[in-house]
Amino acid sequence: MSLLQSHLLMTLGLICLVHCENLVMMPFDHVSHVNFFVVTAHTLVKEGHSVTFVIAPRHKKTLDKHGLNYITYDSVNGDKSDDLRKAMENDVFGENKEPVSLMTTLSTIKNLVDNQKLDVLGDKGLKQQMDATEFNLAIIDGTLFCRYLYVLAYRHSIPYITLTASDDPLASGVTGLPSVQPLPAFWFTDNMSVTQRLINTFAQFMTLYVLPAVLYPNSIITEYAPNKPAVSMAFLYKQSELVLVNLQDVCLDYPRVTAPHYQMVGGMGAYPPHPLPENIESFIQGAKDGIVIMTFGSIFSKMPDRVLKKFFDAFKVFPKLRFIMRNSETTLKVPDNVLPLNWLPQNDILGHPKTILFITHGGNNGQLEAVYHGVPTLTFPLNGDQFSNAVRMRVKGFGLDLQMKTFTTESLIQNLIELTTNDTFRSKIKRCSAIVKEQMPAQEKVAHWVRHVLKYGSDHLKSHSIDMPLYQLLLLDVMCIMMLGLGIVSLLLTCCCRMVISKCCCRSGRKKIKSE
């Protein structure tokens, strides 16, 4: 080896020592969350970092496919995510038009969280592997249903960043305003009535205090991190070096109050399209009026034939359109203008110039991709934040929405006609697409902020609001003092007025007696 080559290798090694860090990623045990973290991991690998995942064994194929490192934990308590999926499918596609009760849903979720918490935090093999590896930074999914992952990072003294699709500013010490920031579970916009603001405020109080207390009692710290100081779960969440939220607040979502440590990075999975597989491309080229893509996410990859028949009957009315859909099983005869697939490259099809409409469940990632590529949507919200997502697309003029339990073939046909012939939807979402593409790409934002925190830390980004109790953050104590002051002033003025009136009455009474 020449002297020049040796010098070059030493230089590259020094650069790597300075800039390359060992990162661990902890996503929620759900396909869409793992896929989102995989996209983020590729961005960080390009930066030169080493990335390792902590995952359930069922996600190993996904990580192997992408050539990423991982540590697994044993699912000794059973994979209860199927129970949640079946409950959701029954709620959406069941014959009963009444929704599953809130208490039933919460009970299913609590069982899921309890089992996953035991699997992750109670796994001795995982603990040994984490002890044997020195991680510089953890990137943790901030979804409410997997916040036990913060205990894992805390136990092993790993600083961490939160990466989440859940906008939870108050939990991060940011002045989120329930008056203009609707909770994703509701059909509200940022322009709420008094009743809606009351409901929204109460619901945010429940998600901030009640639900976390039920899912994660503070005893979880002393049980699974006995050698660390006993702190609250709320404290652990606030200790995130940074909170990266997978939302696009420039033109898709509603403008909101943020802070330097609370950054919007919506659109990680949206990028210029790659060439499509030959079978998909040839099918698309046969479309005279364009392509419609339909998928309802990883949970609802198949639907009952009685529901699917309504879609097929509507699609037959548009012979010049072609429909690409994700649906794994059906006994129905598939129309000639429909291509069903077990899996489809959603972003790449949305980016195809012939794609004119996206029929979707309203998942956050899918909406961000639709906006990036400027494709109008027809949304069938199924659960969670999808109801709020459907509303924001409608009020911004980017699409329409229908209900899975109540839609008919006729209503679907009417919506398809409106969305494929009315250029207003396309022009509005194309404008939003242009605005989004003018911003720094989400991948670059994430890379920048991770690099920034690794180099400088995050103390300079955080406001004192993080350490303030909620009543101080919302100035409730100041308002109480002001109301008390106003009350005292009002009382004094009332007393003074009574005294003046009383004296005046006394004087007039004396004069009257003298005159008599």
Q: Across the structure, where does each feature detected by a protein language model lie?
A:
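A donor-sugar binding/catalytic signature common to diverse glycosyltransferases
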Residues: 140, 342-390
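Short amphipathic alpha-helix
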Residues: 34-45, 59
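A short acidic/histidine/glycine-rich donor-binding loop in glycosyltransferase catalytic cores
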Residues: 338-339, 377, 395-404
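Short alpha-helix at the nucleotide-sugar/activated-sugar donor binding site of glycosyltransferases
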Residues: 154, 370-371, 394
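A short, glycine/small-residue-rich beta-strand->loop->alpha-helix junction that serves as a flexible
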Residues: 25-38, 300-301
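Nucleotide-sugar-dependent glycosyltransferase catalytic domains
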Residues: 29, 45-320, 332-336, 343, ...
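C-terminal "capping" alpha-helix adjacent to the active site of nucleotide-linked donor transferases
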Residues: 407-424
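Cleavable N-terminal signal peptides of Sec/SRP-targeted secreted and luminal proteins
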Residues: 2-20
